[in-house]
UniProtKB/Swiss-Prot annotation:
Its EC number is 2.7.7.8. Component of the RNA degradosome, which is a multiprotein complex involved in RNA processing and mRNA degradation. It catalyses: RNA(n+1) + phosphate = RNA(n) + a ribonucleoside 5'-diphosphate. The gene is pnp. Its cofactor is Mg(2+). Involved in mRNA degradation. Catalyzes the phosphorolysis of single-stranded polyribonucleotides processively in the 3'- to 5'-direction. It comes from Yersinia pestis. This is Polyribonucleotide nucleotidyltransferase. Mg(2+) binds at residues 486, 492.
Length: 705
């Protein structure tokens, strides 16, 4: 008999239910978490033993959305879900980031978390539900895990923080922030904002962390009732004697190596020291484990770098804690792109381009929460050569997708609306060198490339990565961190924004004890760094260029009566196809009668506008037009009078005398003046040649097209 154990509680405006014991009983732990009809089934499986020779913690998180959750069948050829979407990849990373630091350092057993969305309410995003589920399942499993964690989404509407806003509420919000953490510490923040102050951003983080305590309390209560026994796992005892011997041989030499400011030269020297020490120790005692020596060397290396920072000594590359590396900013470096920039900060460099397209270049995204169209794309590429390595080149990896989304969040708040700038915009950041914070270099490069392309962004934006080294109550916040400082430090804290405020904030914290004071120091230090970078960027380009590139399509907008849309499209699209072929333009029509004409040549666009005006012009009864015979029938002739319109000249209206045979008077393609006699309710036009050729008739209005 299946007996579920259920925990139900109120979480802001929503009711959350966590249920275990019903399904996937062969997994290490499984929970079904629901929040107002959005339900995510989360399983955890942990291997009891680590693989021999395992040197890293093999945690994988897979978040997957099933279309049946929204009552739909996949639209793919095989009618089933395929490879993970960008959204699924981003949510997998969102779950991974706060749980990874909570496993013991020496725990190397394989752990897999799978979160499957099985029911979705379009108003409730499944990502927070999945995070709560992962936390609950890991806490129930008995696997060594220093959780649970809580998770919350925070909005900012009418100057008030809103807990877990609905999809509709988020449209009105100036902030979309996700925060996750334990009872005592924030571990992860991911956000985008509409240029908010540092105080408002920090307030949102603190608000979200306070509110999520109810989640942690209820998971703890569920674990007390249904939790599995804790694993009998003990960390391998540290070989103190070997640690002391390694430190004696390597510490001073590694300290000298970390005074080499050039990255590749430093890496070469560090690798040589590690190889020498390992070889010397194995020569003395061949029973030693080379992998254990390497682990101890990594620990000594970390201690060398951290202790120097905490003592207030210069950093790896000789900088003080709040110094920014040298900047080099260039725009317009690629002649045929619509906009380009090369942004260099120390040994981190991004080549960024901006391309302008039409509405049909926009990305149509079919998500579980509904379909949407994205007219601003930002893609981030991290080729192996940027760090002096060889490797696979192909489709983007999880990291590239995540960094691209962060850079996009940083720029999104300053992008013009579709009515202000009716283009689809694609920004691509090619990381050509990397030594710390390439995603923030992408934000700076994107801002520069967009201005170079003539995109009327509201303000320039820049990004900076901050780091932290903390031991006890002693802490140092580092500005513009290197890759090594990111790896060996306790926090990765990225902030993007304009002179007026923050547009994106991302935090990943590896330790507990990060207080509001520390986050405040980091945010304030980041603001100073951001303003410094913006000052240098403004020397290269301070405002968007007045015109777009000569190689970019020009988009002209006109408005017609929505009732005339059918005339412009024509039967089966015949008229609009003929128009695009004739004028060499791209024409897009919206339901409200807005027409967008894209052309690289202004004259072609003007020609298309003129033709559309002719097609949509009202036919005036009593006016004489120049027409062309298009069809001859027994009872008269059809005559085109321009703009794709055609009327009938009845046989009785061809001449003043009786006409026995139409072809005696008219031939196909013949130009004739015609007078509009009537337009009936169905839009049919009755014409007369006889009335147009009377002595007192006025001159014809226009030539037929």
């Amino acid at each position: 008999m299946l007996t579920p154990i259920i925990r139900k509680f109120q979480y802001g405006q929503h009711t959350v239910t966590i249920e275990t014991g019903m399904m996937a009983r062969q997994a290490t732990a499984a929970v079904m978490v629901s929040m107002d009809d959005t339900a995510v089934f989360v399983t955890v499986v942990g291997q009891k033993k680590a693989k021999p020779g395992q040197s890293f913690f093999p945690l994988t998180v897979n978040y997957q959305e099933r279309t049946y959750a929204a009552g739909r069948i996949p639209g793919s050829f095989f009618r089933r879900e395929g490879r993970p979407s960008e959204g699924e990849t981003l949510t997998s990373r969102l779950i991974d980031r706060p749980i990874r630091p909570l496993f013991p350092d020496s725990f190397l057993n394989e752990v897999q978390v799978i979160a499957t969305v099985v029911s979705v309410n379009p108003q409730i995003n499944p990502d927070i539900v999945a995070l709560i589920g992962a936390s609950a399942a890991l806490s129930l499993s008995g696997i060594p895990f220093n959780g649970p964690i809580g998770a919350a989404r925070v909005g900012f509407i009418n100057d008030q923080y809103v807990l877990n806003p609905t999809t509709d509420e988020l449209k009105e919000s100036r902030l979309d922030l996700v925060v996750a953490g334990t009872a005592g510490a924030v571990l992860m923040v991911e956000s985008e904002a509409d240029i908010l102050s540092e105080e408002q951003m920090l307030g949102a983080v603190v608000f979200g962390h306070e509110q999520q305590q109810v989640v942690i309390e209820n998971i703890n209560a569920l674990v007390a009732e249904a939790g599995k026994p804790k694993w009998d796992w003990q960390a391998e005892p540290v070989n103190e004697a070997l640690h002391a011997r390694v430190a004696e041989l390597a510490e001073a030499r590694l300290g000298d190596a970390y005074r080499i400011t050039e990255k590749q030269e430093r890496y070469t020297q560090v690798d040589a020291i590690k190889a020498d020490v390992t070889e010397a120790l194995l020569a003395q005692d061949d029973t030693l484990d080379a992998a254990e020596i390497q682990d101890i060397l990594a620990s000594v290396e970390k201690n060398v770098v951290r202790s120097r920072v905490l003592r207030g000594e210069p950093r790896i590359d000789g900088r003080e804690k709040d110094m920014i590396r040298g900047l080099d900013v260039r725009t317009g470096i690629l002649p045929r792109t619509h906009g380009s920039a090369l942004f260099t900060r120390g040994e981190t460099q991004a080549l960024v381009t901006a391309t302008l397209g039409t509405a049909r270049d926009a990305q149509n995204i079919d998500e579980l929460m509904g379909e949407r169209t994205d007219s601003f794309l930002l893609h981030y590429n991290f080729p192996p050569y940027c760090v002096g390595e060889t490797g696979m080149v192909g489709s983007p990896k999880r990291r590239e997708i995540g960094h691209g989304r962060l850079a996009k969040r940083g720029v999104l708040a300053v992008m013009p609306s579709a009515s202000e700038f009716p283009y689809t915009i694609r920004v691509v950041s090619e990381i050509t060198e990397s030594n710390g914070s390439s995603s923030m270099a992408s934000v700076c490069g994107a801002s520069l490339a967009l201005m170079d392309a003539g995109v009327p962004i509201k303000a320039a934006v820049a990004g900076i990565a901050m780091g932290l080294v903390k031991e006890g109550d002693n802490f140092v916040v580092l500005s513009d961190i290197l890759g090594d400082e990111d790896h060996l430090g306790d926090m990765d804290f990225k902030v993007a924004g304009s002179r007026d405020g923050v547009t994106a904030l991302q935090m990943d914290i590896k330790i507990e004890g990060i207080t509001r004071e520390i986050m405040q120091v980091a945010l304030n230090q980041a603001k100073g760094a951001r303003l410094h970078i913006l000052g240098v960027m403004e020397q290269a380009i301070s405002t968007p260029r007045g015109d777009i590139s000569e190689f970019a399509p020009r988009i002209y907008t006109m408005k017609i009566n929505p009732e005339k849309i059918k005339d412009v499209i024509g039967k089966g699209g015949s008229v609009i196809r003929a128009l695009t072929d004739e004028t060499g333009t791209t024409i897009e029509i919206e339901d409200d009668g807005t027409i967008k004409i894209a052309a690289t040549d202004g004259d072609k666009a003007k020609h298309a506008i003129r033709r559309i005006e002719e097609i949509t012009a009202e036919i005036e009864v009593g006016r004489i037009y120049a027409g062309k015979v298009t069809r001859i029938v027994d009872f008269g002739a059809f005559v085109a009078i321009g703009g794709g319109k055609e009327g009938l000249v009845h046989i009785s209206q061809i001449a003043d005398k009786r006409v026995e045979k139409v072809t005696d008077y008219l031939q196909m393609g013949q130009d004739v003046p015609v007078k509009v006699m009537e337009v009936d309710r169905q839009g049919r036009i009755r014409l007369s040649i006889k009335e147009a050729t009377t002595p007192d008739a006025e001159a014809p209005e226009a030539a037929a097209e």
